[in-house]
């Protein structure tokens, strides 16, 4: 328990069924409150579901769980039949209604029906995916996914996509070349893209950051057109893993906050890519910032948490 710093529950590694031996979790789990079920993709290639049997007494201030034995499965398709493939899942899943969306290390993005655990579709995206995708309901009532790949297996390129969430079909693909390969720290899209909010001046734009391009310690921030995938603007900066966030004023004018690997927090005009202000926080910022009202909060590799006020 948090207030006692004791372990409430622990589950061991599955050795016989997993596709990959690596037993870590990079993805963040999701909990379905209605069914009291935790859903968690693993780097060993297994998708876990765990009934938590949660008991919460608000008046007494008590919380307990008594998890059932985890139920897990794995997925193989014609796109990833090579036994040498590292079919782990490092990006966090998206769940919309009863459908889960997630990608694996070898360039497959797929959709699972959580009611049946059936694989609905799988789409090749050419490389590893570390960053969580973004879901959008389109003006046509259709669901769409925006996602990007890291540069782990491809030759100097990463890819940004818009997918049809029902069929998995590619609406557009934008390739970004000139990425430096580093076997210890991959380049490409390593942060979740930022989708512009409807009814604001960011509408129709999706913002990606590509790390290690055009050199080892640089990156490129760019805005793409959500309909076509065409680059609206691009800006060179230090590379980052931190995901950008947006803040909007009452008139619907948007501003972007993005943090980089040398400790800078930038306030950016999302329509042009121009830097409006920069605050130095002293060390690498790998975490993504959160915004509450006019306060930005973020942690750094320097073991400090900062609150930055927007004025």
Locations of the language-model features?
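Short loop/turn segments that connect beta-strands within beta-propeller blades
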Residues: 5-9, 52-55, 113-117, 164-167, ...
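Residue position within the beta-strands of beta-propeller blades
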Residues: 40, 102, 147, 207-208, ...
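Extracytoplasmic beta-rich repeat domains
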Residues: 8-31, 60-95, 122-141, 148-153, ...
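Short glycine/acidic-enriched loop and turn motifs that connect beta-strands
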Residues: 44-47, 108, 150-155, 200, ...
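Blade-level signature of beta-propeller repeat domains, shared across WD40, Kelch, NHL, RCC1
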Residues: 280-311
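Short, small-residue-biased leader/transition segments that mark boundaries at the very start
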Residues: 1-2
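Short coil/turn segments that connect the beta-strands within blades of beta-propeller domains
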Residues: 34-36, 97-98, 142-143, 203-204, ...
